[in-house]
Structure formats: C-alpha cells, structure tokens
C-alpha cells in the first residue's frame, strides 16, 4: 500500500507512537499484557475465586468491565452531575459466578471505583496504563462483532444490513484512542460521521460557538481517520470533500453511504489484533511467565501459542452447544468476525459455521436468567495453524456470496480470493453520479466494475504450523470455491443494542 511508510504500525499506536524497533515493541506490548494479568490475579484474590472460577469467561468479563467503568472519566463525571436513583456513581460491580454445592450461583459484587483504580495502577507499576484498558475494550468489541449483527444500527443510519462486514469495532467507546481507531471498520467510521451530521441537521447550535469548534475538530479528525483507511485516490478525494464541507448535511451523508458501499469491493485498511480475555493473561502470569521479558505481539504467533496452552471455561445454557460457544469465542479472540469462513475452518482445523447455524447466544448471562439449569464447559480455543493478522483490505475480487453478508473484511494475511457479491453490490450504484463528487464517483464505480473474480489477494502468503514460530514455511490453503464464505449468512444473530 502506497502510504504504508507514513502510517504508524499499530504496535506503535499501542505504545504512544514512539518509533521503536521490533524488540522494544514486543517488550512494550508484553508489559501491557503483564499488567492486565497481574490485575486479574489480584481481583481473583479479592473476590476469593477458585482457580476454576477465575478461568470462567463470564467472571473475566465482569472484572474487565469493572475496571473499564472505574476509568471512564466522562461517564463518571456525568453520573456525579446527574445522580439517578439506585446508582452510586462512586461504585462499580457486576455478577460474579461461583460454584456452590455442585451448582453455579450468581453473586452481585460492588466495589469503590477508587479501590479498583488503585488495584489496576498497582498492577501496572503505578501507571494508568490506558493501553491495557484499550486492549480490553478491543476484546469486548471483537466479542460483540462475533456475537451480534448490527442490522438495526445500519438501517438507522441509512445503510444496508448486508454491509455488516464493514462494521468492525462498532461498539468501541469513543475514548479508545489511536489503537481503537485502527481497528474500526469503514462502516463504523461512516456511521459515527452520519450520526454527527444528523445531529448537526437537527440542532442549529451543534457546529456553533466554543463547543461547535471542538465538534468541528472532532468531525475533521474522524474524516481523516476514515480517509486513511481508503486505499484509492478517488475514495480519499471524496473524503476530502466531506471533511471540507462548510455545513455538513444530506449531501455528505449520501457521499459517505456511497463510500461505504464502495468499500465492499475497494476494501479499506482495517487493523486486526488478537485481544484475549483477562482470564487468559492472569493464569499465564501466575504460572511465572514474563510477557515483558519474552516479548509479545498481538498480530503474530503469540496469541495462538497462548491459547494452545490456556484453559478457559464458560457457563452454558441448557439448549446451547458448547462447541458453538467455543467457535464464537475463538473468532472473537482472533478478531475474525468478518473473515472468510473457509479460511477460518482451515486455520482452526475444525469447521467454522455461519452465525445463524450456531446454537448459542451471547457469552454474557442476563441478570434474570435462571442459574439452576446452568452448566459449564471448557472452551476449545486451540488452532491447527497460525497466520499473521492483516491491516490491509487485500485487493479485490469477486465470488458468489450470501444473502446475509455480501463481502468480507480479511483478518489474516493468507493467499485466497476474497468473496463478494458483485451484482448485488453494483445494483446499489444506479445512476446517481451527478453533483460535486460526480467525477470521483464515476472513477470509483469504474474501479469496482474492473474488479476481477480470479484475482488473488495476499499472494504468496500462507498459514504456518504452530511449530514454525519464525514463519519460514508458508502453507497456502486450497478451498472449495463453491462453498459459502460469510459468517452472517441468512442472519439469525441477535441484535446488539445498548
């Protein structure tokens, strides 16, 4: 990609952007993982969790959420100023599950946010360790991406629910920084911008005054983030138009939706990182593993090796299939919600099925669910091969795709053709090429028309045996091309709504 040299790698984003060499980056990411692990161990001690209970993914999610809430300054300020009945703004908590007399019990715990912040800082050598917090946010985001299809959110902003492959990171909080921005899909950025423009249309003062200046700054920053994800000059030029608009309105919304559609074929660069639950890092640190000394990368073999040697458990509802629950979490751990299922099946070594075929609901258990019938089982998170995560969209290519999802967003840098349903996508581009962006629109449509089905992406890249740590022998997988490639096919996924 042409601008690769000017972009910071996402390890640099993880490490506040100093230019570092690979060893320093690995140590720095390792230090972040150590901090999460130490914090988790301490929380398990505070909560008096057994080893098994500490490896329960539902407990991990509650503990992660508590620390994220303790450090959410804007929300904390908001809660102080708008006290609501029954919510103590200084406290945070959630459900903790314990095994009592052969049954799973739910216990609601409550802690001072100040106390949680103290434990977190202590585990991170006195630092706020924002990177560790962002890491947990991205893990939650990846889990949401795998569990829910954002149909309603897409429709609300005027987009087509079949564009779900563009929605990576759509539930990431705004405060997730540069590392968060790197993993957001094109559709996510478009949705954030459209929401902003709609507020401006409905509220005359949105862009005015001191606040309006800040808002405008945020708008232009978001436009630049989105522009940086596009890989063609015409798409970028259109983003300049949207950014420079005096008074963003419906024309800009149209342009953004056009760009989002175009990204189904002319895919943007979206980073992928394997962010694992805290209950994976905790036991590894407890066993004496020193991530900072050994070094760690979110985009190489390390997360695969860690998952090969981890025991993670999950609560299972009466009519859920534990193997399906495992697939859900495995995909989330590998940031692969929108990847081609044929490739995922190859890497995992077992068949990866579309979301609608899985007999499993989300990982979290609602407070009104009956605990008497809950069982627990081991999550199978191991893989047959490993592959390098990508931060490019690959180049384009066409293949029959499904009703539920009409394109993919690659997560792994592995040679294959990238399926997308060209006729369905192109049908959306009827006629509308007038107006100030007409030449760019025409150019974009021309490039999309030219996308060839036989084109191969990531040429020469393969997957690797788990013993091949230095990635010396790439294995290029071969696929049955007639097979279904998309995860949200047909779509029975539940809706994600906060």
UniProtKB/Swiss-Prot annotation:
Family, as annotated: Belongs to the influenza viruses nucleoprotein family.
Role summary: Encapsidates the negative strand viral RNA, protecting it from nucleases. The encapsidated genomic RNA is termed the ribonucleoprotein (RNP) and serves as template for transcription and replication. The RNP needs to be localized in the host nucleus to start an infectious cycle, but is too large to diffuse through the nuclear pore complex. NP comprises at least 2 nuclear localization signals that are responsible for the active RNP import into the nucleus through cellular importin alpha/beta pathway.
Quaternary structure, from the entry: Homomultimerizes to form the nucleocapsid. May bind host exportin-1/XPO1. Binds to viral genomic RNA. Protein-RNA contacts are mediated by a combination of electrostatic interactions between positively charged residues and the phosphate backbone and planar interactions between aromatic side chains and bases.
An individual GO BP term: viral penetration into host nucleus
Localization of this protein: Virion; Host nucleus
Taxon lineage: Viruses, Riboviria, Orthornavirae, Negarnaviricota, Polyploviricotina
Biased composition annotated in UniProt, kind: Basic and acidic residues: 8-21
Annotated coiled-coil segments of the chain: none
Segments carrying motif Unconventional nuclear localization signal: 1-18
Residue segments, region Disordered: 1-21
Molecular function GO labels: RNA binding; structural molecule activity
Major localisation: virion
Descriptive protein name: Nucleoprotein
Locus of motif Bipartite nuclear localization signal: 198-216
Keywords recorded for this protein, A-Z: Capsid protein, Helical capsid protein, Host nucleus, Host-virus interaction, Ribonucleoprotein, RNA-binding, Viral nucleoprotein, Viral penetration into host nucleus, Virion, Virus entry into host cell
């Amino acid at each position: 990609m042409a601008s690769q040299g000017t972009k910071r790698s996402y390890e640099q984003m993880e490490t506040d952007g100093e230019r570092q060499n690979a060893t320093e980056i690995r140590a720095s990411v390792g230090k972040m993982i150590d901090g999460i692990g130490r914090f988790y161990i301490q929380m398990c001690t505070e909560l008096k969790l057994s080893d098994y209970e500490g490896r329960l993914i539902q407990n991990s999610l509650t503990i992660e959420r508590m620390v994220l809430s303790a450090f959410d300054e804007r929300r904390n300020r908001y809660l102080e100023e708008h006290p609501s009945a029954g919510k103590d703004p200084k406290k945070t908590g959630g459900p903790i599950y314990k095994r009592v007399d052969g049954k799973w019990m739910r216990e609601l715990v409550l802690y001072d946010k100040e106390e949680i912040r103290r434990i977190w800082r202590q585990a991170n050598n006195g630092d706020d360790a924002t990177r560790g917090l962002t890491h947990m946010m991205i893990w939650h985001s990846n889990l949401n991406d795998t569990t829910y299809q954002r149909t309603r959110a897409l429709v609300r902003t005027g987009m087509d629910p079949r564009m779900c492959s563009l929605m990576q990171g759509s539930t990431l909080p705004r405060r997730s920084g540069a590392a968060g921005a790197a993993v957001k899909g094109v559709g996510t950025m478009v949705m954030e911008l459209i929401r902003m423009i709609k507020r401006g249309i409905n509220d005359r003062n949105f862009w005015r005054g001191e606040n309006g200046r800040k808002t405008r700054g945020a708008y232009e920053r978001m436009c630049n983030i989105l522009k940086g994800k596009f890989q063609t000059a015409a798409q970028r030029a259109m983003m300049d138009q949207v950014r420079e608009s005096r008074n963003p309105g419906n024309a800009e919304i149209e342009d953004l939706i056009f760009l989002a559609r175009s990204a189904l074929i002319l895919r943007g660069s979206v980073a992928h990182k394997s962010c694992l639950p805290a209950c994976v890092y905790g036991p590894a640190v407890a066993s004496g593993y020193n991530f900072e000394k050994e070094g760690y990368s979110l985009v190489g073999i390390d997360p695969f090796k860690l998952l090969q040697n981890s025991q993670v458990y999950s609560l299972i509802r009466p009519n859920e299939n534990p193997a399906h629950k495992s697939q859900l979490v495995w995909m989330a751990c590998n940031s692969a919600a929108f990847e081609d299922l044929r490739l995922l099946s190859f890497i995992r070594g077992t068949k990866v099925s579309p979301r609608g075929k899985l007999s499993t609901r989300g990982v979290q258990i609602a407070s009104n669910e009956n605990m008497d019938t809950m069982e627990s089982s081991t999550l199978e998170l191991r893989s047959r091969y490993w592959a390098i995560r990508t931060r490019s969209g690959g180049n384009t290519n066409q293949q029959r795709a499904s009703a539920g999802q009409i394109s993919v967003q690659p997560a792994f840098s592995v040679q294959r053709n990238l399926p997308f349903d060209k006729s369905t996508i192109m049908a959306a581009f009827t006629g509308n090429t007038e107006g100030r962006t007409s030449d760019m629109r025409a150019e974009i449509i021309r490039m999309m028309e030219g996308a060839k089905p036989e084109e191969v992406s990531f040429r020469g890249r393969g997957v690797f045996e788990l013993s091949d740590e230095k990635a010396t022998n790439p294995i290029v997988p071969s696929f049955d091309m007639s097979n279904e490639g998309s995860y949200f096919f047909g779509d029975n996924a539940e809706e994600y709504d906060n």
